């Protein structure tokens, strides 16, 4: 299992500030573990990347997707092949919050130096000429019709579409009683696995209305 995650709520003592992340290691788990433990402390991506590369004996790299909620703003950043999808309003739209960078790489290099598909990520010292740590970032205001956010690794999105994920998670997330977030995550993981995903599958669900 090379996936890791982090969730820090009540950031700086403010219940409306939080940071969440899903991290997917490749070539080992060290980079994913390092990012999960340090990214909240060093929001600027170069700090984490440069610090990791200095760690003796650390190899491999990590893709990641993070969501920072602060002062009513939602900052979603992605480096690699993870993805963030938001459920918006009564129309239940599954809105992806990152460019499909994996599609760009498929039509250019396919694999970087024969070993890596994604052009962004943390670590990968031997591929630093081609792999950058700077994430794709989208900033938006948290609105009343923003229901929940799904952060997940490629293991989910390889087999489950944005809209499918939203449709499956929504009944669990918007219950009038206590939301069943863990059950929703398990449902999504099981669906991807049943369709033949052999990747590690990590899913995180974040209710957004608490941050409005």
UniProtKB/Swiss-Prot annotation:
SUPFAM superfamilies for the chain: PP2C-like
Question: What EC number(s) are associated with this protein in UniProt?
Answer: 3.1.3.16
Query: Record keywords: Magnesium included?
Result: yes
Give start and end of each PPM-type phosphatase domain: 1-208
| MF terms in GO | metal ion binding; protein serine/threonine phosphatase activity
Q: Which cofactor does it need?
A: Mg(2+); Mn(2+)
For this protein, what reaction is catalysed?
A: O-phospho-L-seryl-[protein] + H2O = L-seryl-[protein] + phosphate; O-phospho-L-threonyl-[protein] + H2O = L-threonyl-[protein] + phosphate
Which keywords appear in this protein's UniProt record, sorted alphabetically? Answer: Hydrolase, Magnesium, Manganese, Metal-binding, Protein phosphatase
Query: What broad class of enzyme is this?
Result: hydrolase
Identify the domain of life: Eukaryota
UniProt binding sites for Mn(2+): 199
UniProt similarity note: Belongs to the PP2C family.
Q: What is this protein called?
A: Putative protein phosphatase 2C 53
Q: Which organism is it from?
A: Arabidopsis thaliana (Mouse-ear cress)
